[in-house]
């Protein structure tokens, strides 16, 4: 399972520089290490630089081992097996959340990785639902636009330059790619980002 993408013209670096985002392929019987070759600014689950609010739901799984929650904070955690998963009956159509922004931010894109990503159990990507169409809306301005999201675990971006800068962004699920086993829709990673990502083909 190869996961990669290229971010162009990163802030604070040479304008011609290219940043790589990638997951190393998992070897049989071993978990992939070095999940990302480089972390984009956005933090991890422990020290997030992005915050989320007004999330409509999240999945809580109960088993003999205990309880596991697929919380919205997982969206800024790049480690494998840490998606946000909606928690309502059905495919999560209409579920939503808000990504908070910073007063000094100049983000023009949403950087995301679709689905449930697991190097040790890659079939979870197909078995769970993935977002297909989303509504992106400025919380203050009310400006909104629909986008089709690619059905790929590779990093991709959504251009939100139509929104005023420093505006909180509301995401609503409008349609999904249905999973083959679980009636749950997952997003592995989603933050606001300054640069476009060139998807791996």
Language-model features: locations:
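Residue-level detector of intrinsically disordered/flexible regions characterized by low predicted structural confidence
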Residues: 10, 30-33, 76, 134-137, ...
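Compositionally biased, intrinsically disordered low-complexity segments
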Residues: 21-22, 58, 134, 139-142
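Aromatic, loop-rich ligand-recognition surfaces of beta-strand-rich domains
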Residues: 69-140, 157, 164-201
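Disordered, acidic Ser/Thr/Pro-rich linker "stalks" and the adjacent N-terminal cap
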Residues: 3-100, 196-201
